[in-house]
Structure formats: structure tokens, C-alpha cells
Amino acid sequence: MFDGIGFMELLLIGVLGLVVLGPERLPVAVRSISGWIRAMKKMANSVKDELEQELKIEQLHTDLKKAENQGLKNLAPELQDSIDQLKQAAESVNRPYQVEDAPSAKETPAKETATTETTSTENAKSDKPNG
């Protein structure tokens, strides 16, 4: 945590803090400073995680472009893995929409089939000669 500060430096800072702030305000100051340090570490870790995620997305995008250039044939295993990950992500995004659209999609083909059968029956009747 204190990479560049040795034990003697920490002791000196503690003694100076005790002299300047006094024994009553020193614990409060230490708590507030440790809270600030904790908040800064959280922000730094958050930024680091976001950057790693963006780099991963950029790598997947680059792999996808390479795969497109190769025509999706004879792909390297890491490129195929990236494509599989992207397909899974796309399926997970599209899945909620497919569940909502599924009942209307099932009803529509049945209606079209009935209409097609009626039309083909009428066409068959009109094709017969009246004679």
C-alpha cells in the first residue's frame, strides 16, 4: 500500500499529525483520509474495469473483422471462439423480443396456410373445363 514510504517516514508523519492536530482530532482526520483513499481506489478500480471491458469488446470486434475478411472459412480457433461469443451475446439480446413476438408469429402462418388452401381450391375449380 505504501510502496515508497518506509516505517520511519510513517512514524514521522504520525508524530507530526499528533503534534499538529492533537490527540482529539487525529483519529477523525485519519478516518476521513482513509475514507478518501478508499473512494479513490474504488474509482480507479472502476475505471480499470471499464477499460478492460472496452478493450475486450474492441478485441472481439477486431476478431470479427478478421473473420469477415477470411470469409468465415478456415478460421483460427481464437477467432471462432470470438464469433461464438458474439453469437451468444446476440442471441441473449434477441431472445426477449422473440418470446414476445412468438405468439403473433405462430398465428400468422396458420392464417396464411388457410388462405392459401382456400385460394388453391378456388383455382382448381376454375381450371376445370365447363363441359
Swiss-Prot record:
PANTHER family: SEC-INDEPENDENT PROTEIN TRANSLOCASE PROTEIN TATA, CHLOROPLASTIC (PTHR33162:SF1). It comes from Shewanella piezotolerans (strain WP3 / JCM 13877). The lineage of its organism: Bacteria, Pseudomonadati, Pseudomonadota, Gammaproteobacteria, Alteromonadales. Its main location: membrane. Residues 105-123 have a biased composition (Low complexity). HAMAP family: TatB. NCBIfam families: tatB. Belongs to the TatB family. It is found in: Cell inner membrane. Part of the twin-arginine translocation (Tat) system that transports large folded proteins containing a characteristic twin-arginine motif in their signal peptide across membranes. Together with TatC, TatB is part of a receptor directly interacting with Tat signal peptides. TatB may form an oligomeric binding site that transiently accommodates folded Tat precursor proteins before their translocation. The Tat system comprises two distinct complexes: a TatABC complex, containing multiple copies of TatA, TatB and TatC subunits, and a separate TatA complex, containing only TatA subunits. Substrates initially bind to the TatABC complex, which probably triggers association of the separate TatA complex to form the active translocon. GO terms for biological process: protein transport by the Tat complex. The chain crosses the membrane at residues 2-22. This is Sec-independent protein translocase protein TatB. Keywords: Cell inner membrane, Cell membrane, Membrane, Protein transport, Translocation, Transmembrane, Transmembrane helix, Transport.
